[in-house]
Structure formats: structure tokens, C-alpha cells
């Protein structure tokens, strides 16, 4: 397996040396998309927020900076990711930032806990996406928001041919799945042809 292939195979569940390199790459390269997407959400002070597929923990930092007195939770299936996210946020770990290893499909949180759930460049790898969306809806408060941020659209074989286990969805497909999961006021926002944020609200 070539070096590039090895690196991008670590997108779904970073492991080992290549996984750590991928987490650094994600923290840096996801910044423009994440910062733009979070501006669309109108985050309020004191919110309780969750980032699913938290990777290297940079989105947890960005959420915390946008909400005074917030509590920010991260969950990721990768042990390497959780370790990196904890290190990046160690000054506020277990005070304002709480990170755990786990799956998008079976989250260890009570019903109606979060004001906002985010998913940055991660839904491509979620197993049984409709079930995962129902789980997101379960942990959101009534009126809570779910923001999906993606840089890849359906049919982008440049990535899906390189990254094992990746499924690219169009923004329209994701919006339809949010509608089917019971989210309301779903909207698609575009920054570039291949950059989108899809937002839904738990009614």
C-alpha cells in the first residue's frame, strides 16, 4: 500500500503513526469549513454541545470559543482520536470539555441533552446513517440544532476511490435524510461547489 493510500485509509478511524499524522492534517485543513459552518448556527452562551467524530479535537476548541460558559462533548470511534482531542483540550478537560470513545449510532448520552450537535467531515463513515441521524435527534433538546459540514459531494471519486469505507452524499441527499429522520427547517448552505453545511432542527 502506498504512503498516500495508508494516510487516507486513516480518515475513518485513525490509528498509529499514520493516524496521528492524519489527525494533525484534519485539525488544520478542516478549519475554514468548520469556522464558516459554525457562523451559520448562531451559537449562544451557555450551550451544551456535542461534536461527533471529533477527530483531533480542534472543533471542540472552536465550539468552546463561541459560547461563554459552554460545555462541549466529543465522541469518536478511534482511540487515537480521543487521546489527541484530550491532549489538545487538556487545560479544560473534564471541566468544560468532555471526550469519550464511542459510536455515532449508539451514544452514551441521555435524551435531550444538547443544544447543538455538529458533524464535520465525518458522516461519510457513519454506519447505517439513518439510524445515526435518529440517535442525533434523540440526544438533542427540543429546538436543538444539528449541523453537518462536508467538503465532498456525491460521485467525488477522487476521494471515494482512495479512502476505504467512504460514502459521499450530496447535500440534497443529506437534507432528505434529515427530513426523513424528523428534523424540521432543514437548510443547505454552500460556500463552494463542493463545500456545504446542512442544518436541521429538532422540532
Residue map of PLM features:
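A short glycine-rich, Lys/Arg-flanked "PGG" loop and its adjoining helix->strand segment in the class I
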Residues: 130-142
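Short alpha-helix
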Residues: 166-181
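Conserved alpha-helix/loop element of class I SAM-dependent methyltransferases that forms part
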Residues: 28-47, 62
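Class I SAM-dependent methyltransferase SAM/SAH-binding core
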Residues: 50-106
